[in-house]
């Protein structure tokens, strides 16, 4: 149920960038929607939490969503970069998904999630 990870960069201890390939065969695309499949927002949040709790904030878990904005759909076959930034002092995880269009990146979604122990 997770995407194929192409590359991972962690330029700082509290920040990670993960390049993902959205395989059209992913479970999340089935039935969402028949005419044009797209990656549901719940999957995007699930993946952000998956990587955050393993790479940046082990021992922390989901508390609530402070804000989230879905700006453009993520389609099957897309290459995207998931950027996660962890601010432990504020217990806040910031995430963004950027869709790759050649050398250009377009923000598809972003948000802030509050974590707790």
What residues fall within each predicted segment?
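Catalytic strand-loop segment that frames the active site of acyl-thioester-processing enzymes
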Residues: 1-39
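HotDog/MaoC-like acyl-thioester-processing domains
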Residues: 4, 11-15, 85-117
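A generic structural signal for short beta-strands and their flanking turns/coil linkers
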Residues: 14-18, 29, 61-66, 78-80, ...
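Hydrophobic residues in beta-strands and at strand termini
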Residues: 20-22, 70, 115
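Aromatic side chains
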Residues: 29, 33, 70, 95-97
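Acidic, aromatic-enriched beta-alpha/helix-loop junctions
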Residues: 34-46, 50, 54-55
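Hydrophobic beta-strand-centered segment that forms part of the acyl-chain substrate-binding groove
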Residues: 49-83, 88
């Amino acid at each position: 149920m997770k995407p194929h990870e192409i590359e991972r960069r962690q330029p700082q201890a509290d920040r990670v960038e993960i390049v993902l390939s959205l395989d059209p065969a992913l479970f999340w695309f089935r039935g969402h929607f028949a005419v044009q499949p797209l990656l549901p927002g719940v999957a995007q949040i699930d993946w952000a939490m998956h990587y955050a709790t393993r790479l940046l904030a082990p021992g922390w878990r989901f508390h609530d969503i402070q804000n989230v904005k879905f700006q453009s759909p993520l389609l099957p076959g897309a290459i995207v970069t998931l950027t996660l930034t962890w601010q432990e002092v504020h217990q806040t995880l910031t995430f963004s998904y950027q869709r790759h269009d050649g050398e250009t990146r377009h923000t598809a979604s972003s948000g802030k999630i509050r974590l707790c122990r």
